[in-house]
Amino acid sequence: MADIRQNIDKKANRRGAARLAAVQALYQMEIGGAGINDVFAEFESHWLGSEVEGDKYLPAEAAFFRDVVAGVVRDQARLDPLIDDALSRGWPLKRIDAILRAVLRAGSYELEHRKDVPARVVVSEYVDVAHAFIEKEEVGMVNAVLDQIARRFRAGEFAR
């Protein structure tokens, strides 16, 4: 039983690392104009599971990382209006910091497409990712926006 729990924890940690890397990659693509193939190559060879500038990055589930990044890029034109609808009036997505946009886009993509991960886990994981980059009050906004989007895509999970 302990071995099963360890394997689940390792997979969760690898996915958490993939989420963090996906948000960093999406941010880099938006700010630096990097292409998706360049970002994949850079992250997979230099970041995932490596030490960069004194920070040790956990090994990440590369396929999960690729899925989230590619999915956000593919679906961004459809995801952005959904996020805009969930944001407070007067705060359109374009007014929000780029790293926060990356967190919300990645979380929204995963809520819509990764049904293998419970909605509450997705929201919690991206709140944790947000803590790595942004202030406390903005983390609350990430929680509220992703919770609203989760209820839209996965209402059945919240009816229980």
Curated annotation (Swiss-Prot):
Keywords: RNA-binding, Transcription, Transcription antitermination, Transcription regulation. It comes from the Bacteria. InterPro entries: NusB-like_sf, NusB_fam, NusB_RsmB_TIM44. One of its GO terms (cellular component) is cytosol. It holds the Pfam family NusB. Disulfide bonds: none annotated. The keyword Transcription applies. One of its GO terms (molecular function) is RNA binding. GO terms for biological process: DNA-templated transcription termination; transcription antitermination. Belongs to the NusB family. Involved in transcription antitermination. Required for transcription of ribosomal RNA (rRNA) genes. Binds specifically to the boxA antiterminator sequence of the ribosomal RNA (rrn) operons. This is Transcription antitermination protein NusB. It comes from Nitrobacter hamburgensis (strain DSM 10229 / NCIMB 13809 / X14).
